[in-house]
Regions:
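General beta-strand structural signal in soluble alpha/beta enzymes
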Residues: 16-20, 42, 64-67, 93, ...
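Conserved PLP-anchoring active-site segment centered on the Schiff-base-forming lysine
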Residues: 35-50
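Short acidic/polar capping segments at secondary-structure boundaries
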Residues: 47-48, 67-71, 96-100, 120-123, ...
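Active-site phosphate-binding strand-loop segment of PLP-dependent enzymes
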Residues: 56, 68-123
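A short secondary-structure junction signal
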Residues: 75-77, 101-107, 125-131, 147-150, ...
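Conserved active-site segment immediately N-terminal to the catalytic lysine
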Residues: 116, 130-141, 150
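Active-site C-terminal subdomain of aminotransferase-like
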Residues: 140-169
Length: 169
C-alpha cells in the first residue's frame, strides 16, 4: 500500500483496498455502497460502461447523461455540460474502453458530484490526480497484478457503515 500511495500521490484521506473478485464485481459493489439517494449518472462509452450500467440499474435509477452508442462507441462524448440532477449520488466513467479503443482526454464536468472511474486497462500507465475522484478502481490483471484482484482507492467520507442490507461478500 505504501508503495502505491507514494507512486500515485494518494492523499491521506483516501483508503486503498486490495479486494478479490475482480473489477466486474465493482459494477454492483459501487452502486450498492454509493447510491444513498438511489440515483447515479453514467457515461456510456463502450462495452465495459454498458455492463456497469446494467448492474447499477439493479440498485437504483441510472441516468445515461452521454453516450457514444450512436457511432458504435468510437468516441468519448462531450461531457463538459452534462445534465446531472442535484440528488445524483455519483458520476461513473470507464476511463479507457479497450474493446472500442476510446479514452478520456479530459475528465467530465461532474458539477461537484463524486466521480467514479474504472481505470482497469490504464491503471498506473500515466499520472493520475487521485483528488479529482471519489473512487477509482482497477482490475489489476491487465497491468500490475494477478487475475481476480482489484485495487479500490476511495475517499474516506464515502465509506459507509450504516448499510445493513448488503450481501455478506
Amino acid at each position: 500500500e505504501k508503495d502505491l500511495r507514494d507512486l500515485m500521490g494518494i492523499p491521506d484521506n483516501y483508503k486503498v483496498l486490495f479486494i478479490q473478485g475482480g473489477a466486474t464485481l465493482q459494477f454492483s459493489m459501487i452502486p450498492m455502497n454509493l447510491m444513498k439517494n438511489g440515483k447515479a449518472v453514467y457515461i456510456e462509452t463502450g462495452a465495459w460502461s454498458k455492463k456497469a450500467i446494467a448492474e447499477a440499474k439493479k440498485c437504483g435509477e441510472v441516468i445515461v447523461a452521454a453516450s457514444s452508442k450512436d457511432k458504435n462507441y468510437t468516441y468519448v462524448p462531450d461531457c463538459s455540460d452534462l445534465d446531472i440532477p442535484e440528488d445524483t449520488d455519483y458520476v461513473y466513467i470507464c476511463e479507457n474502453e479497450t474493446i472500442h479503443g476510446v479514452t478520456y482526454n479530459k475528465l467530465p464536468n461532474t458539477k461537484g458530484h463524486i466521480l467514479v472511474s474504472d481505470q482497469s486497462s490504464m491503471f498506473l500507465s500515466k499520472p493520475c490526480n487521485v483528488s479529482d475522484y471519489g473512487l477509482i478502481y482497477a482490475g489489476v490483471q491487465k497491468n500490475v497484478g494477478p487475475a481476480g484482484m482489484v485495487v479500490v482507492i476511495i475517499r474516506e467520507d464515502l465509506i459507509r457503515d450504516d448499510l445493513d442490507n448488503l450481501p455478506i461478500y
